[in-house]
């Protein structure tokens, strides 16, 4: 039988909700042990507060940024972009947040992989962050390639470095974030035998670079897909995307069949 994770719907208590830079916020909440047991790549459906004058909306899917089972803590890193995240930005210490999760299928680390390369852009870096913690616990080396518009908008660098990861930053403003340069960086890591697998989130262009290298050089990988969702449980089918599975186009639900998928099967 396929593994079915435990899911809870509960009111978590906000511990902190602080700005990281001009665009991103770091939210920490106290929750149950079940919620705090979420794995890298999984997500929660958050019932965000409603800002004044905004229309009602559905729960917001949010990838796990960090967990602590011992302290029963759950962390999210989010960018304030719409009604949902504007509502999250209103939360202060002591407030309650309605959460449902952990949901979906997360990342899997093959015991044979000793060197991982994580490639992310924007909010995708939040999804990859828990991977660095788990990799360190298993004695696996991580090299992270972070992409952003400007250096001041790059997030999670300190977190990755605190877990022993090497971090390479590329940005639009410095003209270093283009696919050609990222491919050059990745080929260098491969030549140095520092890439047993790719892990990625946040950029279709960078996904295609990794797929091309993976296909040519036989390097496996996983991608966390970003998609709008309604239920988050696989019942409403609003998050369906097409995947190329052994030459056949197969429709899958990002929320329940993923959000983590085989790198080579994803269609940008």
Locations of the language-model features?
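Short, basic/aromatic-enriched C-terminal tail that caps enzymatic domains
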Residues: 2, 251-268
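Ferredoxin-reductase
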Residues: 2-93
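Structural signal for conserved beta-strand scaffold positions within catalytic alpha/beta enzyme cores
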Residues: 16, 66, 169-171, 223, ...
């Amino acid at each position: 039988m396929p593994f079915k994770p435990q899911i809870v719907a509960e009111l978590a208590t906000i511990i902190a909700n602080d700005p990281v830079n001009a665009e991103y916020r770091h939210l920490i909440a106290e929750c149950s042990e079940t919620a705090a047991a979420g794995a890298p790549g999984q997500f929660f459906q958050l019932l965000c507060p409603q800002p004044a004058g905004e229309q009602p909306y559905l729960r917001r899917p949010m990838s796990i940024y960090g967990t602590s089972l011992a302290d029963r803590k759950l962390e999210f890193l989010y960018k304030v972009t719409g009604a949902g995240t504007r509502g999250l930005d209103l939360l202060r210490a002591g407030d309650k947040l309605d959460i449902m999760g952990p949901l979906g299928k997360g990342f899997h680390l093959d015991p044979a992989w000793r060197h991982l390369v994580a490639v992310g852009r924007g909010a995708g870096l939040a999804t990859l962050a828990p991977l660095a913690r788990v990799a360190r616990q298993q004695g696996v080396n991580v090299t992270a390639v972070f992409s952003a518009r400007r250096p001041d908008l790059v997030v999670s660098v300190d977190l990755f470095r605190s877990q022993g990861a090497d971090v390479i930053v590329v940005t639009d403003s410095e003209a270093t974030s283009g696919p050609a340069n990222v491919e050059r960086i990745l080929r260098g890591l491969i030549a140095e035998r520092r890439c047993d697998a790719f892990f990625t989130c946040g950029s279709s262009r960078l996904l295609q670079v990794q797929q091309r290298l993976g296909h040519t050089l036989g390097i496996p990988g996983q991608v966390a897909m970003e998609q709008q969702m309604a239920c988050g449980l696989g019942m409403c089918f609003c998050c369906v995307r097409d995947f190329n599975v052994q030459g056949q186009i197969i429709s899958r639900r990002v929320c329940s069949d993923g959000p983590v998928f085989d790198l080579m099967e994803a269609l940008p």
